[in-house]
Design a protein with these regions (language model features):
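Glycine-rich phosphate-binding loops of nucleotide-dependent enzymes
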Residues: 1-273
Length: 273
């Protein structure tokens, strides 16, 4: 029992009792939107419960865009289409004004697009490999010889810089969810054009959630566009500049986060706009 309260209830005090801290005010990046980074023009693609249907949207440098909707409503397909991981049935994708509609993550990646999946161990990291071994996979080399000493030093730097609670020889499955996410974020380059993230704070404690968003907002201040999905509407409103609501594979609401609230987003998620 963390506390007790009699009516009338104070919402802020209840949240403090439940989570150990009062609710956080908006921590949006609020960067002026720059040039076009990503543009989808009438894109349709299969997947999930409803796929993605006739989607047209533009994302600009420095924007943080949150994707809301029931699971399977199109958010995951949208992110994977934007990353070059899913084929198109119709439409086209532009990156910084250049058409790039082939289903090829490496081609998108060469243009500064990076995708961080929700399934950290299933898609993001390799179970049974250590932090050092992950660092070794990232290093450029001209021979088949694995540069373990250099990789161990690199792993140590990542652990220190990202405050990961682990050691270079720690297998990644032994890390907590928050530390797995910190490790994944440590693999990103310093200046991506576009970051696409599925549920980046899934299962994390409040301290880790705040750390993740402080880190991600440091990218948008350098001009990176960020698009992320989350089932938590409060989180989306706290950190995003703009919200896209998906319903049955379509974007049915595109609104500035400062101009909406949980009730309006909830209605849109139910298809009521």
């Amino acid at each position: 029992v963390a506390g007790e309260m009699a009516q009338p209830f104070d919402t802020e005090q209840l949240l403090k009792m439940m989570f150990g801290a009062p609710p956080h005010p908006p921590m949006r990046c609020a960067q002026p939107a720059g040039d076009e980074v990503l543009a989808l023009d009438r894109v349709s693609s299969p997947g999930g419960r409803s796929g993605l249907v006739d989607c047209s949207i533009t994302v600009r440098r420095g924007e943080v865009v949150g994707l809301a909707g029931l699971e399977g409503s199109g958010q995951e397909v949208f992110l994977r289409v934007a990353a070059g991981l899913k084929p198109l049935q119709a439409g086209s994708v532009r990156l910084s004004g250049q058409a790039l509609s082939e289903n090829d993550y490496h081609a998108f990646n060469r243009r500064g697009v990076y995708f961080v999946p929700s399934a950290r161990l299933e898609e993001g990291l390799i179970p049974e490999l250590t932090i050092t071994e992950h660092a070794a996979l990232l290093q450029e080399r001209r021979t088949l010889r694995v540069p373990y000493p250099a990789a161990a030093e690199d792993a140590g730097r990542r652990i220190e810089s990202f405050r990961i609670k682990g050691r270079p020889r720690t297998p990644v499955e032994e890390l907590s969810g928050g530390n797995q996410q910190r490790l994944l974020l440590s693999f990103l380059p310093p200046d991506p054009a576009l970051l696409l993230l599925e549920n980046p704070t899934r299962g994390l404690d409040l301290e880790s959630v705040n750390w993740v968003w402080r880190h991600l907002h440091s990218y948008c201040r350098r001009g990176t566009a960020i698009v992320f999905s989350s089932p938590e509407l409060d989180e989306i409103l706290m950190v995003a500049d703009r919200v896209l609501v998906f319903f049955n594979g379509r974007i049915i609401l595109d609104v500035a986060a400062a101009e909406t609230d949980v009730q309006n987003l909830g209605s849109a998620i139910a298809g009521k706009v």
